């Protein structure tokens, strides 16, 4: 009865769509409440009064679920507030209900006891209501409603944006799941630090002022959807697409591409050519352009001016060696230029109206330019200025436009004048070249280079014209000014700025010894020669006290049939160069010498040719043949198969001198030693010995070796023979044998002084003998006499010296040097560390990587040239002793320490390579190997 009355009395006014999920939720809640009332109505009327009322306001579109405990005091207010009308259909029914309730009082008392027990176990609504405020209840209801909606819509997909009004609310507890919000991947702090920071700032701002929370300010508002979009290329063109206004875009794209990348057409090229011919139109066209940036302005180049490659290229290398390459004569260049002038287009532009320059003015300007060149002090600048004269003169000659016929005649006249002018210039230059070639006496000069690098030295072979045979050369010794000048420079054929009488031929000798340089002088009358010779050379000549003695000894060494009273011998220095006897008439330009600081070249004097003396015929014949100069030391047959023997060394060129020198040389007298007769005949066979090792050189080498061995058999004891053979075997198996080629580059002239072995000369930079015994011994004949007339004690001393090990000095014997292995490893590791820094500038990274790779190349080269068995043999060798049995040097000398350090470094390097290949290597094995190496060293 009570259930039916409840259903009749509770009427819920709802005006909404039954499909609304909020309406469904309200229906579910009403069903639950009705079920509760049916259970409680049978026992008493209090559950009916305490029943929670459900309402839906017609004004509010949303549904609010409210649970309130209703007391009998505010029952009327509650009913009026929530718009629930309870119709009293029959007062009799109310009375009957009250009677029924009172009649069943005893039963209700029993039921209340059982219900009170159930309420004691479950918390009642009053207890929950007392602990929560109204705002908290409203918040909980909103959260439940939001979760209900998400669960009904299936919002478990994280691609759906969250409700920022709920997600940005202040958290209740740290473990509350509702306070967590989903952050998209593009706001990750490592991927997008600025976006993450702005997102956190927005969170803090919303937490501080929750009323100003705006859901539209979320960082995801620009994201349409996180789902994968459909590909735009997935659509296929169909036949019926034309109905839907489909248009193929490929022709449009192709037209746009051709418009951007098409080449110039013929009419456009013609238009550009016409603009180039008429600069006024070009200027007016450019002025008419608006908003043109200055860097976009066109380059107005006249069509008759064109870029031409220089006729000469000067290649500058380190080491003061300059090489000049000529590509053509100035006459051909002038002919080409005149041809281009004849083809000059006709235009009335004022830019091209230049008054013609007469040939006389050209000659005057050329003479002034030549005189200025002769007064300059820089030889390299003179060479460059001399070759640029043709282009400078031709650039000034640009005749104006008159008539066609008159212009042709004028142009022909001007070009003929220019051609004649430059033909005369070429003749003068060829005369200068012939003078320089004869003054040098066809001496093949080149810069000194290490013996294992012949490609760095260039050869100059000027010809010897017979009609210029009256020129003579006087060779005098002078002191060089700089030790670093290692190049012997000859006078260029086309150089006018360098006087003929002041060409210095310099060669360097190691340490502090005075060098002997050769100055070539042209023989002129006495008054002219005194004026033209620089005063510095005379002062330097006075400084050398031993120059007279050298000339005297060299004079004695000349052949008797070539000796005349008026000739003075020249100081000969051997050079690793061979000239071809039948040289071509074309002049190969020699190296241009670098200017020496502090040295002033005197201007070129007027040349007065002297008649050819009858006694000069023999000297001319010998001057036509190539001559060999000593540069640093006198090599012997042991200097390699491509080196000349003593028999192949020619005497110096014999030339006439001034009367003063005749009087000075007439007083000299001495016995002359005959020279080998086969020197000239053998020399002609070895013209290209530098480039090709011929069989003749090997035969000569063997023959000379046999002769020398026969001479030594009478003087050298058996012990010295065994020592020399031991030395040869040691040289073959030496550590640096493969690095420096053969050991035959050492000189065979025995040093007289007993200098310590570690001061022995490197093959390229050590004098022949000690300064105390052989001062400035430079002539070939004197060196021969020294080798032949040496006594037995000197030979034994040289043989004893040969048994000592050869010590190589860094930066003298070889161009590389190594640090201790620990230092090298530290440098290498530091380079790796520095290279790993990406902020380091690029040029520093390049320098470091170049250093590392050059270091690795050096280590690999040394390791490949130094086998380990030789290293172990060298470590096991006992300390060498003299013939007398005395210890030669200390065990802890610099050489022994250096050798031991190198052995340790190589052993450790190989062990490290093996450890890298074998992954299971440990530090213990490395230490054991080091101990073994140290034991072997001891």
UniProtKB/Swiss-Prot annotation:
Start-end of Pro residues biased regions: 587-596
GO biological process assignments: cell wall organization; establishment of cell polarity; meiotic cell cycle; positive regulation of G2/M transition of mitotic cell cycle; signal transduction
Gene Ontology CC entries for this record: cell division site; cytoplasm; cytosol
Annotated GO MF terms: protein phosphatase regulator activity
Positions with biased composition (Basic residues): 702-711
Compositionally biased region (Basic and acidic residues): 57-67, 127-140, 467-485, 512-556, 622-635, 798-807
InterPro entries found in the cross-reference section: Zds1/2, ZDS1_C
Its job: Has a role in establishing cell polarity. Also required for maintenance of cell wall integrity, sexual differentiation, calcium tolerance and cell morphology. Involved in Ras-MAPK signaling pathway at cell cortex. Has a role in meiosis.
Listed name of the protein: Protein zds1
Protein's organism: Schizosaccharomyces pombe (strain 972 / ATCC 24843) (Fission yeast)
Source organism phylogeny: Eukaryota, Fungi, Dikarya, Ascomycota, Taphrinomycotina
Gene: zds1
């Amino acid at each position: 009865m009570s259930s039916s009355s409840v259903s009749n009395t509770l009427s819920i006014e709802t005006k909404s769509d039954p499909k609304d999920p909020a309406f469904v939720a309200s229906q579910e809640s009403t069903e639950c409440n009705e079920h509760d009332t049916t259970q409680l109505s049978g026992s008493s009327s209090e559950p009916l009064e305490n029943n929670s009322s459900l309402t839906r306001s017609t004004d509010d579109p949303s549904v609010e679920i409210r649970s309130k405990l209703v007391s009998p005091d505010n029952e009327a207010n509650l009913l009026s507030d929530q718009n629930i009308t309870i119709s009293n259909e029959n007062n009799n029914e109310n009375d009957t209900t009250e009677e029924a309730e009172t009649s069943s009082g005893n039963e209700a008392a029993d039921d209340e006891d059982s219900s009170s027990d159930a309420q004691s176990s479950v918390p009642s609504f009053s207890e929950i209501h007392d602990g929560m405020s109204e705002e908290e209840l409203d918040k909980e209801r909103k959260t439940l409603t939001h979760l209900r909606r998400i669960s009904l819509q299936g919002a478990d997909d994280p691609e759906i944006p969250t409700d920022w009004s709920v997600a940005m609310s202040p958290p209740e507890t740290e473990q509350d799941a509702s306070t967590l919000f989903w952050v998209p991947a593009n706001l990750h702090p490592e991927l997008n630090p600025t976006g993450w920071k702005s997102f956190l700032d927005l969170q803090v701002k919303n937490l501080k002022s929750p009323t100003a929370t705006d859901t539209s300010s979320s960082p995801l508002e620009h994201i349409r959807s996180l789902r994968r979009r459909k590909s735009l290329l997935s659509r296929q063109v169909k036949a019926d697409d034309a109905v839907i206004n489909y248009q193929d875009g490929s022709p449009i794209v192709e037209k746009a591409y051709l418009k951007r990348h098409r080449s110039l057409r013929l009419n456009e090229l013609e238009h550009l050519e016409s603009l180039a011919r008429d600069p006024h139109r070009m200027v007016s066209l450019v002025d008419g352009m608006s908003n043109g940036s200055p860097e976009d302005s066109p380059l107005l180049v006249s069509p008759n001016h064109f870029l031409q490659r220089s006729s000469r290229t000067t290649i500058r290398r380190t080491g003061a060696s300059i090489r000049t390459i000529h590509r053509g004569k100035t006459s051909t260049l002038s002919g080409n230029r005149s041809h281009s002038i004849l083809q000059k287009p006709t235009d009335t532009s004022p830019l091209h109206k230049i008054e013609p320059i007469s040939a006389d003015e050209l000659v005057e300007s050329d003479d002034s330019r030549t005189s200025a060149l002769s007064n300059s002090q820089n030889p390299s600048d003179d060479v460059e200025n001399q070759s640029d004269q043709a282009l400078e003169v031709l650039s000034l000659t640009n005749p104006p436009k008159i008539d066609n016929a008159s212009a042709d005649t004028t142009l022909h006249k001007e070009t003929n004048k220019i051609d004649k002018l430059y033909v005369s210039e070429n003749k003068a230059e060829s005369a200068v070249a012939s003078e320089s070639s004869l003054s040098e006496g066809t001496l093949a000069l080149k810069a000194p280079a290490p013996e294992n690098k012949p490609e760095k030295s260039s050869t100059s072979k000027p010809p010897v014209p017979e009609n210029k045979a009256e020129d003579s050369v006087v060779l005098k010794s002078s002191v060089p000014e700089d030790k670093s000048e290692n190049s012997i420079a000859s006078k260029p054929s086309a150089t006018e700025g360098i006087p003929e009488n002041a060409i210095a031929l310099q060669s360097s000798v190691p340490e502090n010894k005075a060098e002997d340089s050769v100055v070539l002088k042209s023989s002129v009358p006495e008054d002219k020669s005194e004026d033209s010779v620089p005063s510095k050379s005379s002062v330097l000549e006075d400084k050398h006290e031993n120059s007279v003695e050298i000339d005297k000894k060299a004079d004695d060494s000349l052949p008797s049939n070539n000796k005349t009273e008026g000739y003075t011998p020249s100081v000969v220095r051997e050079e690793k160069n061979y000239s071809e006897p039948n040289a071509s008439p074309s002049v190969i330009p020699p190296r241009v010498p670098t200017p020496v600081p502090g040295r002033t070249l005197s201007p070129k004097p007027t040349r007065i040719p002297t008649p050819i003396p009858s006694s000069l015929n023999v000297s001319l014949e010998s001057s036509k043949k190539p001559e060999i100069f000593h540069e640093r030391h006198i090599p012997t047959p042991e200097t390699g198969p491509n080196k000349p023997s003593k028999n192949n060394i020619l005497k110096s060129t014999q030339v006439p001198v001034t009367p003063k020198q005749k009087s000075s040389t007439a007083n000299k007298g001495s016995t002359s030693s005959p020279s080998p007769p086969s020197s000239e005949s053998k020399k002609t066979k070895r013209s290209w010995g530098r480039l090709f090792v011929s069989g003749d050189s090997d035969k000569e080498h063997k023959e000379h070796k046999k002769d020398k061995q026969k001479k030594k058999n009478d003087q050298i004891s058996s012990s010295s023979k065994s020592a020399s053979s031991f030395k040869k075997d040691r040289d073959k198996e030496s550590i640096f044998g493969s690095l420096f080629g053969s050991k035959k580059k050492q000189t065979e002239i025995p040093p007289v002084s007993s200098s310590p072995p570690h001061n022995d000369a490197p093959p390229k930079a050590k004098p022949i003998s000690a300064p105390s015994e052989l001062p400035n011994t430079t002539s070939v004949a004197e060196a021969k006499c020294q080798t032949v007339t040496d006594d037995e004690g000197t030979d034994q001393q040289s043989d004893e010296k040969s048994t000592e090990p050869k010590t190589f000095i860094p930066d003298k014997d070889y161009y590389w040097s190594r640090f201790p292995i620990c230092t090298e490893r530290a440098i290498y590791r530091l380079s790796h560390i520095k290279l790993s820094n990406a902020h380091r500038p690029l040029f520093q990274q390049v320098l470091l990587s170049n250093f590392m790779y050059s270091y690795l190349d050096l280590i690999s080269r040394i390791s490949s040239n130094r086998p380990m068995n030789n290293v172990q043999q060298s470590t096991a060798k006992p300390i060498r002793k003299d013939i007398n049995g005395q210890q030669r040097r200390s065990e802890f000398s610099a050489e022994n320490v250096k050798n031991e350090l190198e052995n340790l470094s190589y052993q450790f390097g190989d062990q490290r390579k093996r450890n890298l290949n074998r992954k299971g290597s440990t530090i213990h094995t490395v230490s054991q190997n080091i101990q073994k190496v140290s034991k072997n060293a001891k």
